[in-house]
Amino acid sequence: MLGLDTPHDHHGGARRGRNTVRQFTFGALRVVHMGDIGCVPDETTLAALRGCDALLIPVGGYYTVGAEEALAIAESIAPRCIVPMHYRGEGFGFDVLGTVGEFTALFDAASVHTLGGDTFTLTADAPRGVIVPRLLHFV
């Protein structure tokens, strides 16, 4: 596992502290979890993550990057699949967060794969694009 230190905000971490981006390697598969990233990372960080198989990235904004910045990060890293996280949905999430639809609307509809369940298996032949699992939430 690789951990990369990044600021959590646009002020070098002065407002929200630091964030750790984690890269996990499972055989030939690389999975990147962006944590609570709140700004576009520097080029050195982006280069270390480039070409990963799966990118888990917040898209809801306010506490983290929003849809547009998440897209910019994803385009720079160029993962095989993107899994959005930290957003508001029907019946869950903070009112200040954007929805997953605000992020997926930035992509061609054919590249957005909405799942019927909350899990999927990442394989070498998994579909490219945005993977949106059905989220479980508790009231």
For each predicted feature, which ranges?
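Glycine-rich loops and low-complexity Gly/Arg-rich segments
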Residues: 24-27, 48-49, 57-59, 80-83, ...
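Binuclear metal-ion centers of metallo-dependent hydrolases, dominated by the metallo-beta-lactamase
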Residues: 81-139
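Short histidine/acidic/glycine/proline-rich micro-motifs that form metal-
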Residues: 8, 61-62, 88-93
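Core dinuclear metal-dependent hydrolase active-site scaffold
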Residues: 1-50, 54, 62-68, 115-139
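Proline-aspartate-enriched helix->loop->beta-strand connector
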Residues: 53-57, 61, 67-88
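Charged helix-capping and loop-helix junction motifs
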Residues: 16-17, 50, 66-78, 96-100
